[in-house]
Amino acid sequence: MKAAVCREFGKPLVIEEVTLAKPQASEMRVKISATAICHSDISYADGAWGGTLPAIFGHESVGIVEEVGAGVTQVKVGDCVVVTLIRSCGHCRGCSRGMPVTCETSFPLDAKSPLTSKSGESIVQAMRTGSFAEYVVVHESQVVVISKDIKAASASLLACGVITGFGAVTNTAKVEAGSHVVVIGAGGVGLNAVQGARVSGARSIVAVDLSDTKIEAAKTFGATHGINSGKEDVAKRVQEITDGRGADYVFVTVGAKQAFDSSYGLLAKSGTVVLVGMPANGVMSEIDPGTMAAYSQNILGSKMGSARIQVDIPNLISLYEQGRLKLDELVTKTYNLEEINEAIAAVKRGDALRNVIVF
């Protein structure tokens, strides 16, 4: 099969013919229909988080099940599935507490990649998916069956960008109606945090970004206010918008140190900062612990929106079908696999909400 292989950090991906092993017990092979370009893929491919090469990235996908291994019960050949990176056993401590994103179990696919080059060289199945390729082999816990009626490019976003942003609001923070919410970063994840806040009934939803274009886009997704952090005093504007109280919730959806450092100063008393974006290895953020303790403020981490994919993805699809969740509008442009480096470059320039590779 064809795949876009990363052989050197920070360099263009290389289109190669690679070999994919047959699915084993509890696994399946999925023919990828669409896979989105996520900033996490770019950060990994740039070497921001280390890792081993060669590797195939891509983790935000949808496709058709073509083969199943022994014991697979949740899906059948021909099903359309959203493919996520969340691999879970269902019975460890993390899973038992309703947090499959923190599953502690090691799987055969974790120990040995199903991917090899034509010369027999092992290729890392990055982010437990490796969907910058025509096919993937994944564990059955990683997929959710959906209708084939949803556009593939739109459906692929449910695998990461949507559940991460929306879920940070609804699952991790559990934002209450009437809350004042600030979302730092108006990219794909940030826009879905905005949508989560809107659906949750937030009183004000403030989108903060360096791009006026993205701020205007955020308003179409539900933001009530926009602040360009390169032109305005964010803390002052947030105080004005919230009648001098500050924000009940601040969601940091980008990986910039300045975004983390500035977020705590936007909080109201008893307010909560939710860390969603992922900085490069070694980046540290500074807080004022005395103020946070005195004001009963909180910091939460949110991985993949604390998602339970078998519950959350069907719920998100229901909101989409009701017209309460925008998916189609998140897709900026579609590309074929051979154009993947062009798609990545556009994301790096800030020219896209989500670019999607279609097969």
Where would I find each of the regions flagged by the language model?
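Glycine-centered, small-residue-biased loops immediately flanking beta-strands
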Residues: G271-T272, Q297
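Residues located in well-ordered beta-strands
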Residues: K2, V14-T19, K31, V62-I64, ...
